[in-house]
Every structure is written in C-alpha cells, then in structure tokens.
Amino acid sequence: MRIAVLFFTIFFFMSQVLPAKGKFKEICERPNGSCRDFCLETEIHVGRCLNSRPCCLPLGHQPRIESTTPKKD
C-alpha cells in the first residue's frame, strides 16, 4: 500500500509541471534584447534569434542630436 501511495504522489506532482515554453522568454545574444514577431516603436531590430524572429532592443534614453547642417534663410 505504501508503494501505491508513493506512486500516486509522484505522478500527481509530475502532472503539475508547467511547460517551459510558456514561462520563459527567449533572449537573444544581447542582455536586454527579446525575441518578438515585430519590434515595437520604442525598440530597434539588432539581429535574429535562434527561432528566426527579430531580436529587439529597447531604445532607452537616447540623447537628442541636433542637426549640424546650416539652415537656409
């Protein structure tokens, strides 16, 4: 009877394991990058992931660069 209870508890806890694909986000070679179907407006495309999706990096706080071209009057 002990063996039956042991097997029951083992099979019960094994059935509770969630699939890894749904819980973990695939990360591209960049530390802050993420694999998506399409990059958001606030992200840039920097390469491809292992599943051939684009690797997207957030832009963050980029300094605004003023144009050095002289203005025509």
Swiss-Prot record:
Disulfide bonds: C28-C55, C35-C49, C39-C56
Subcellular location: Secreted
Top-level lineage group: Eukaryota
Pfam families: Defensin_beta_2
Entry GO terms, CC: extracellular region
Cited InterPro entries: Beta_defensin_dom (IPR025933)
Signal peptide: 1-22
Chief location category: secreted
Assigned keywords, A-Z: Antibiotic, Antimicrobial, Defensin, Disulfide bond, Secreted, Signal
Any one of the GO BP annotations: innate immune response
Family: Belongs to the beta-defensin family.
Function according to Swiss-Prot or TrEMBL: Has antibacterial activity.
Name of the molecule in the record: Putative beta-defensin 108A
